[in-house]
């Protein structure tokens, strides 16, 4: 397996790998990583679909990519997916998956046309004082010290950041900036999270720094992620005769492990209550999605909080069982045990057709929520909320069969141990109606109307004990390599597998690890697209410098006297050169 860039490799079709007709594949879980791996096995590995088996513990595919109408509760979205144009592996996948919405088009075609016709951006990113837009919204408000800390972090080597927290590398200057408000609420970073992952994010998305404040960097699907991404993949794979088995819990994979070789010999499962073992040969490839951020989710309703839990589910127990067999299979406890009580645990879906509530939403987002087009353009964050509450409405309706007069709002609180201004409770203690009341309060609904309007919404809370597990501080070796050294037939896929440079909590990471696993185990002779190399582009770096300093010119940026002298001399030498052109393009001179 090797990395590539450019369209020479992107448009090429690899030859059929030797011996693939004699191979089969077992994929543990039916999340995006597994569905992507199955697709790459068929398209690029040219494996027969009937030789591919997807084993899913639940009765529904999709993993964390959800969006359902629960008959007892109502519409539920545990989260959303922010995408961008340089998710190279994701788009490589979906260019080959037929759209369920547009005839003779791929999912990529559909997505591309949609976001061309209705580009995403926010008209109000942060509010305070019960519905008032933050006066400095749109500015980064980074001090000289904070900017220096960002640069220092990016210049460090990854191995210098083993088990280092964000709070270890950033001071109060940075944590008090608008940049941090945008960053932490958009990505769900918190000060106790991994500085290593923070660095990856900064370097991975530096080309989108200019779109951080207004979300113009982002792209979204038409409907919820289950209907827009998962269902087309499922239908595509079913048409290729891939086998889906639900109600199957994989308890363990027996692996013969040495430093030189790892061979999966059997899969121990419980199928509808019966224990079984699936024997394996080296021709039987196993793809494991280790760990899960939505495992063990509990649900409440309008009148009941979602019950807190810390019980690990099958994906964590499987990873624990694998890690005891081989130290190269990672350290799951690092991610799912002892998450701080302040962490994000709860999100909620509020569904309503109440015109007064919809009007309050429109007052903040400056768009008609029922237009079928972009609404908030990403999350709106309440800066003075103790919960650090945020909410968003993507294009409505979010569900294909949803009534035309209805909207579904996604709400989450970054801090789970703080009491709300309206409810005087933590979000964990709140029923759906109480979460809705807190949201309506911060939107500026008069207090005497809040309770009645909250009753006009059906709000379903979800408690996810491991939702921020990706971000916990880690060191090299805590996550297994996608294909461990010497592995003959076992690979790890998803956001708890280790690959270079890319960032977790993204659809791209799931698809990238799947692609790498398939290409390596089958020896597919085609390059995996490298992570977009924006951090190596001097134009992008100069533009980022301008944005991080809120558009100031070089001669306006606060510098020590000596640095100012050096800057003036360098600018004089750059006059009339290509360097001057670059600085002008970046709005620095």
From Swiss-Prot:
Effect listed in the UniProt record for changing residue 34 to A: 1.7-fold decrease in catalytic efficiency
E.C. no: 4.2.1.53
Catalytic activity: (R)-10-hydroxyoctadecanoate = (9Z)-octadecenoate + H2O; (9Z)-octadecenoate + H2O = 10-hydroxyoctadecanoate; (9Z)-hexadecenoate + H2O = 10-hydroxyhexadecanoate; (6Z,9Z,12Z)-octadecatrienoate + H2O = (10S)-hydroxy-(6Z,12Z)-octadecadienoate
Manner of cofactor binding, per the entry note: Binds 1 FAD per subunit. FAD does not seem to be involved in catalysis but rather in the structural stabilization of the enzyme.
Pathway(s) this gene product operates in, as recorded in its UniProt entry: Lipid metabolism; fatty acid metabolism
GO biological process: fatty acid metabolic process; response to toxic substance
Record field: temperature dependence: Optimum temperature is 25 degrees Celsius with oleate as substrate. After 120 minutes, the enzyme activity is nearly unchanged at 25 degrees Celsius, but is reduced to only 25% at 35 degrees Celsius.
Keywords linked to the UniProt accession: Detoxification, FAD, Fatty acid metabolism, Flavoprotein, Lipid metabolism, Lyase
Cofactors (names): FAD
Positions contributing to FAD binding: 33, 56, 64, 82, 250, 292, 506, 510
GO MF assignments: FAD binding; fatty acid binding; oleate hydratase activity; protein homodimerization activity
Subunit organization: Homodimer.
Physiological role: Catalyzes the hydration of oleate at its cis-9-double bond to yield 10-hydroxyoctadecanoate, probably in the (R) configuration. Cannot catalyze the reverse reaction. Is not active with saturated fatty acids and trans-, cis-5-, cis-6-, cis-8-, cis-11-, cis-13-, cis-14-, and cis-15-double bond unsaturated fatty acids as substrate; is only active on cis-9- and/or cis-12-double bond of unsaturated fatty acids without any trans-configurations, producing 10-hydroxy and, to a lesser extent, 10,13-dihydroxy fatty acids.
Protein name: Oleate hydratase
Source organism per UniProt: Macrococcus caseolyticus (strain JCSC5402) (Macrococcoides caseolyticum)
């Amino acid at each position: 397996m090797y990395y590539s860039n450019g369209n020479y490799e992107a448009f090429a079709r690899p030859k059929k790998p030797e011996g693939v007709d004699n191979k089969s594949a077992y994929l543990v879980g039916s999340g995006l990583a597994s569905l992507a791996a199955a697709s790459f096995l068929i398209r690029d590995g040219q494996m027969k679909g009937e030789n591919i088996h997807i084993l899913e513990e639940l009765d529904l595919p999709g993993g964390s990519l959800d969006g359902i109408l629960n008959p007892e509760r109502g519409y539920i979205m545990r989260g959303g997916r922010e995408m961008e144009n340089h998710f190279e592996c994701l788009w490589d996948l979906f260019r080959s998956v037929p759209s369920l919405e547009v005839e003779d088009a791929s999912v990529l075609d559909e997505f591309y046309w949609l976001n061309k016709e209705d580009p995403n951006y926010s008209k109000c990113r942060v509010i305070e004082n019960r519905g008032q837009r933050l006066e400095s919204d749109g500015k980064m408000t980074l001090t000289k010290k904070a900017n220096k800390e960002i640069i220092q972090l990016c210049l460090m080597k990854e191995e210098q950041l083993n088990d280092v927290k964000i709070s270890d590398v950033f001071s109060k200057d940075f944590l008090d900036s608008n940049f941090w408000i945008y960053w932490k609420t958009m990505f769900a970073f918190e000060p106790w999270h991994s500085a290593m992952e923070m660095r990856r994010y900064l370097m991975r998305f530096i080309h989108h720094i200019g779109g951080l404040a207004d979300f113009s960097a982002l792209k979204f699907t038409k409907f919820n992620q289950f209907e827009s991404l998962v269902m087309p993949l499922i239908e595509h794979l079913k048409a290729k005769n891939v086998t889906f088995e639900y109600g199957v819990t994989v308890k363990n994979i027996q692996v013969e492990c040495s430093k030189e070789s790892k061979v999966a010999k059997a899969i121990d499962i419980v199928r509808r209550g019966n224990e079984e073992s699936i024997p394996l040969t080296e021709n039987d490839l196993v793809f494991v999605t280790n760990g899960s951020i939505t495992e063990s989710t509990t649900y409440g309703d309008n009148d009941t909080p979602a019950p807190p839990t810390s019980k690990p589910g099958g994906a964590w127990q499987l990873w624990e069982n694998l890690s005891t067999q081989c130290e190269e299979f990672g350290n799951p406890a690092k991610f799912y045990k002892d998450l701080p009580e302040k962490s994000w645990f709860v999100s909620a879906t509020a569904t309503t057709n109440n015109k007064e509530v919809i009007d309050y939403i429109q007052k903040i987002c400056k768009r008609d929520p029922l237009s079928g087009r972009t609404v908030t353009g990403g999350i709106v964050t309440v800066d003075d909320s103790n919960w650090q509450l945020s909410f968003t409405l993507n294009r409505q309706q979010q569900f294909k069969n949803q009534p035309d007069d209805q909207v579904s709002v996604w709400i989450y609180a970054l801090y789970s141990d703080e009491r709300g201004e309206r409810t005087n409770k933590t979000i964990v203690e709140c029923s759906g109606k109480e979460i809705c009341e807190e949201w309506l309060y911060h939107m500026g609904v008069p207090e005497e109307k809040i309770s009645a309007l909250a009753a006009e919404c059906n709000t379903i809370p979800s408690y996810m004990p491991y939702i921020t597990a990706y971000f916990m501080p880690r060191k090299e070796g805590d996550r297994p390599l996608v294909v461990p050294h010497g592995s003959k037939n076992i690979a790890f896929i998803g956001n708890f597998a280790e690959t270079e440079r890319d960032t977790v909590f993204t659809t791209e990471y799931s698809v990238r690890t799947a692609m790498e696993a398939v290409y390596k185990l089958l020896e597919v002779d085609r390059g995996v697209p490298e992570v977009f190399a924006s951090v190596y582009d001097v134009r992008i770096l100069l533009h980022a410098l301008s944005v991080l300093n809120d558009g100031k010119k070089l001669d306006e940026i606060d510098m020590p006297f000596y640095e100012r002298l050096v800057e003036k001399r360098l600018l004089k030498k750059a006059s009339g050169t290509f360097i001057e052109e670059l600085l002008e393009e970046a709005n620095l001179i």
